[in-house]
Amino acid sequence: MNQPVVETAELMRRVEQLVDAAANRYRITVQVANRAKRRRYEDLNDDDGNFKPVLRAIFEMSDEMNEPEIIGD
């Protein structure tokens, strides 16, 4: 299974955005790790498993931060 190519500059921009928006750098790191771990076990049969869980967590969390209307609450 080939990993899709991730634009490094885009990934770094999103990571910096998350860290800058967080009050605590350690806490946002733990939140990303927990989301990745949770998604890894929830989506065992998911076909979108091409991205590593931590990359998906970073992209999801930065999207949620930028577009809060995509959160279904």
Curated annotation (Swiss-Prot):
Pfam families: RNA_pol_Rpb6. It is an enzyme of class 2 (transferase). InterPro entries: DNA-dir_RNA_pol_omega (IPR003716), Pol_omega/Rpo6/RPB6 (IPR006110), RPB6/omega-like_sf (IPR036161). GO terms for biological process: DNA-templated transcription. It comes from the Bacteria. GO terms for molecular function: DNA binding; DNA-directed RNA polymerase activity. Keywords: DNA-directed RNA polymerase, Nucleotidyltransferase, Transcription, Transferase. GO terms for cellular component: DNA-directed RNA polymerase complex. Its EC number is 2.7.7.6. It catalyses: RNA(n) + a ribonucleoside 5'-triphosphate = RNA(n+1) + diphosphate. SUPFAM superfamilies: RPB6/omega subunit-like (SSF63562). Belongs to the RNA polymerase subunit omega family. In cyanobacteria the RNAP catalytic core is composed of 2 alpha, 1 beta, 1 beta', 1 gamma and 1 omega subunit. When a sigma factor is associated with the core the holoenzyme is formed, which can initiate transcription. Promotes RNA polymerase assembly. Latches the N- and C-terminal regions of the beta' subunit thereby facilitating its interaction with the beta and alpha subunits. This is DNA-directed RNA polymerase subunit omega. It comes from Gloeobacter violaceus (strain ATCC 29082 / PCC 7421). The gene is rpoZ.
